Curated annotation (Swiss-Prot):
Key words, A-Z: Acetylation, Chaperone, Cytoplasm, Eye lens protein, Glycation, Glycoprotein, Lysosome, Metal-binding, Methylation, Nucleus, Phosphoprotein, Secreted, Zinc
Residues that, per the record, bind Zn(2+) 1: 83, 111, 119
Cysteine pairings via disulfide bonds: none
N-acetylmethionine modifications at: 1
Name of the protein this chain belongs to: Alpha-crystallin B chain
Gene that specifies this protein: CRYAB
One Gene Ontology cellular component: protein-containing complex
Provenance organism: Bos taurus (Bovine)
Primary role: May contribute to the transparency and refractive index of the lens. Has chaperone-like activity, preventing aggregation of various proteins under a wide range of stress conditions. In lens epithelial cells, stabilizes the ATP6V1A protein, preventing its degradation by the proteasome.
Chain residue ranges for the region called Disordered: 144-175
Subunit relationships: Heteromer composed of three CRYAA and one CRYAB subunits. Aggregates with homologous proteins, including the small heat shock protein HSPB1, to form large heteromeric complexes. Inter-subunit bridging via zinc ions enhances stability, which is crucial as there is no protein turn over in the lens. Interacts with HSPBAP1 and TTN/titin. Interacts with TMEM109; in the cellular response to DNA damage. Interacts with DES; binds rapidly during early stages of DES filament assembly and a reduced binding seen in the later stages.
PROSITE patterns membership: SHSP
Length: 175
């Protein structure tokens, strides 16, 4: 019986490490997909390519959670932390960085025992005062961290244009 051996460069000539089987790219609040647990199958076809993980839309993309926004009048971060109680969360400002940390110890759920921990850091834009940043936790588990953006210094004004009779650029004398 012959066994076909497919070299990874032949199967994926342009992206040999494009979509490895891995568990470390999860979002902390998301569940595993069944395809995350199995290696890419070469038994189906030598030309089978596992769909890359960035093409699969995670569930938070539909809800708009875990995002950072910079709007005209404010800066905000929305983060899905439904698996954590307010006592298990910390929000700190360190210089120009917001640090969000969540941790809960091992506890039992319907599937067994679970513990979770995450750290997220967000750079504060230059026009946001770090002392004015606030945070709140909604009833559905969305942590919102926001701060007002500084307004421009003074009202807008129009500057009149005057016309001059002399040219701005003069020709250099030829040697």
């Amino acid at each position: 019986m012959d066994i076909a051996i497919h070299h990874p460069w032949i199967r994926r000539p342009f992206f040999p490490f494009h979509s490895p089987s891995r568990l470390f790219d999860q979002f902390f609040g998301e569940h595993l997909l069944e395809s995350d647990l199995f290696p890419a199958s070469t038994s189906l076809s030598p030309f089978y390519l596992r769909p890359p993980s960035f093409l699969r839309a995670p569930s938070w993309i539909d809800t708009g959670l875990s995002e950072m926004r910079l709007e005209k009048d404010r800066f905000s971060v929305n983060l899905d932390v439904k698996h954590f109680s307010p006592e298990e969360l910390k929000v700190k400002v360190l210089g120009d960085v917001i640090e969000v940390h969540g941790k809960h110890e091992e506890r039992q759920d319907e599937h067994g025992f679970i513990s979770r921990e995450f750290h997220r850091k967000y750079r504060i834009p230059a026009d946001v005062d770090p002392l004015a940043i606030t945070s709140s936790l909604s009833s559905d588990g969305v942590l919102t961290v926001n701060g007002p953006r500084k307004q421009a210094s003074g009202p807008e004004r129009t500057i009149p244009i005057t016309r001059e009779e002399k040219p701005a650029v003069t020709a250099a004398p030829k040697k």
